[in-house]
């Protein structure tokens, strides 16, 4: 509801963004807080949450959480800072009970990826459009895949099935891949031969075909739009000339291969695209746990020394 992309497209929406019922979903989250009264909580949202409706939405959220007994802080985090091979900027909101001054927004340990997207995907079997594989075969795992527990020793592979593509799409994919691999250039739809152009609204379709940045440490953001088509997520290997599979998208999000997404392929792509990357979530959880441990230690020290818990000033 607060997406910057969605805001740019709001003139084409049936329901104006300011009337989107999702704007009040935080009230449902607050119901759980009132019921369980945790010391701390965390939730993730898109970058536009603080600027939506001229900032009014964020002020309403702050005010409401304050009324139910919580202080909240919101900071931009990028999944690539957590070892995930993807640029994914999100607002991570952390809240803690009012009066618990020992608590506050955690400091997260940042890990810059030291591998490439190609190395992340290299042990997944090659596919051509419409094909699938249910085992790895003789493929070599990268150190990143091993160290982060993405793949086990079992030779069972799920969700590695790619969409079928038309001959026209395959020709376009090959051009897009060649441009990227030769000089990191993006395909401009208007530069295609007329025989390959089928969309009337060519202005909005200019950057519709995009190759995953295989030779980089981070690729562009995996989106739920993958459920509609794969043109924006073309596999970087020109021999395969296809869009990425659910398993490949899940790997880019840092999901282990043992994680299975239910439902038809469209629903699986939506789940992957909307998810918080597990490696990022793990570090956020560690940071929250560390804050709670620090508070417990300070309170324990108070019992023996009579000291007062220092007030931690945090922006709200």
PLM region spans:
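Class I S-adenosyl-L-methionine
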Residues: 2-199
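Short, acidic Gly/Pro/Ser/Thr-rich loop/turn segments
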Residues: 1, 100-101, 129, 215, ...
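C-terminal target-recognition/interaction regions appended to catalytic cores
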Residues: 147-316
